Swiss-Prot record:
Probable ion channel inhibitor. Shows insecticidal activity when injected into mealworms. Residues 1-21 form the signal peptide. Belongs to the neurotoxin 10 (Hwtx-1) family. 46 (Jztx-7/10/12) subfamily. It comes from Selenotypus plumipes. Keywords: Amidation, Disulfide bond, Ion channel impairing toxin, Knottin, Secreted, Signal, Toxin. Expressed by the venom gland. The keyword Disulfide bond applies. It is found in: Secreted. Disulfide bonds join 31-46, 38-51, 45-58. GO terms for molecular function: ion channel inhibitor activity; toxin activity. The presence of a 'disulfide through disulfide knot' structurally defines this protein as a knottin. This is Orally active insecticidal peptide-3.
């Protein structure tokens, strides 16, 4: 009984890690959020964000959509 509960918990943890990795891989190809590295040529920021020319990361830009 204890062993089966342990295997169930480990299985759920493994499933969570795999799904998180797949989701992270999918979002890696999209736009960058706050404090995400950008260069304005190949990597871009999401709406509401602007690529800072000084720091080369996405910063909040009020008024930009």
């Amino acid at each position: 009984m204890k062993t089966s509960v342990l295997f169930a918990i480990l299985g759920l943890a493994l499933l969570f890690c795999l799904s998180f990795g797949v989701e992270l891989e999918e979002t890696g190809r999209e736009c960058g959020g706050l404090m995400t590295r950008c260069d304005g040529k190949t990597t871009f920021c999401c709406s509401g964000m602007n690529c800072s020319p000084t720091w080369k990361w996405c910063v909040y830009a009020p008024g930009r959509r």
